[in-house]
């Protein structure tokens, strides 16, 4: 019974992730109406769990030796940076969208928006961790497309405000991710 439930959950995660590429407008529109608790429990946190396992195993493959302290330090630094980025980006987006675009969202709704966009970065990170070519990191640029589409589908901004919103969101998203990753790399790794 539990195995079937887990299998269905991960099948739904894969389907949701694929829909971000296949029909991003529909995916982001449905994300607007999603229940925040369901999103976190059945999509984002399980995806983080898979990411943590991938970091651990990927680092084990790269090291070639089983050094638990090094594996945990690396995995926890990367995972902590991702989670902190998730919350900081959500808070920043909520504040900036309310202040500059008169769009008020709860933190939970903004976490859904950021979570869907960040899931692309998570999957790219998993692929790179397993020695796929580093050029796959360019897939992270798809986040720009999602931010552009999200300004229409999720945030429902007027056409003339979309470009300003997207540029600000790109700067905030990548800036926070870079700063947090830099901080954790210097602090822990």
Residue locations for each model-derived region?
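Selected alpha-helical membrane-embedding segments in polytopic membrane proteins
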Residues: 2-105
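Membrane-interface junctions
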Residues: 30-37, 113-116, 129, 157
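Alpha-helical membrane-anchoring segments
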Residues: 37-51, 113-117, 121, 163-170
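Alpha-helical transmembrane segments of polytopic integral membrane proteins
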Residues: 53, 89-94, 120, 144-148, ...
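Transmembrane helix-loop junctions in multi-pass membrane proteins
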Residues: 56-69, 123-131, 180, 184
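Alpha-helical transmembrane segments of helical membrane proteins, especially in multi-pass transport
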Residues: 81, 85, 108-147
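Terminal transmembrane helical module of multi-pass membrane proteins
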Residues: 127-189
């Amino acid at each position: 019974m539990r195995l079937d439930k887990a299998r269905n959950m991960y099948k739904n995660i894969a389907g949701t992730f694929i829909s971000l590429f296949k029909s991003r407008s529909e995916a982001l529109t449905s994300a607007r109406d999603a229940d925040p608790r369901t999103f976190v429990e059945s999509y984002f946190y399980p995806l983080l769990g898979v990411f943590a396992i991938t970091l651990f195993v990927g680092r084990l493959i790269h090291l070639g030796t089983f050094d638990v302290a090094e594996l945990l330090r690396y995995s926890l630094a990367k995972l902590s940076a991702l989670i902190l980025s998730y919350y900081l980006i959500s808070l920043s987006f909520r504040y900036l969208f309310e202040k500059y675009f008169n769009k008020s969202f709860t933190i939970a709704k903004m976490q859904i928006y950021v979570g869907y966009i960040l899931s692309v970065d998570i999957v790219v990170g998993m692929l790179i961790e397993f020695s796929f070519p580093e050029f796959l990191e360019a897939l992270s640029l798809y986040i720009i497309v999602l931010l552009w589409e999200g300004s229409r589908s999720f945030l429902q901004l007027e056409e003339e405000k979309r470009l300003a919103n997207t540029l600000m969101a790109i700067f905030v998203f990548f800036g926070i991710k870079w700063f947090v990753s830099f901080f954790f790399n210097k602090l822990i790794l």
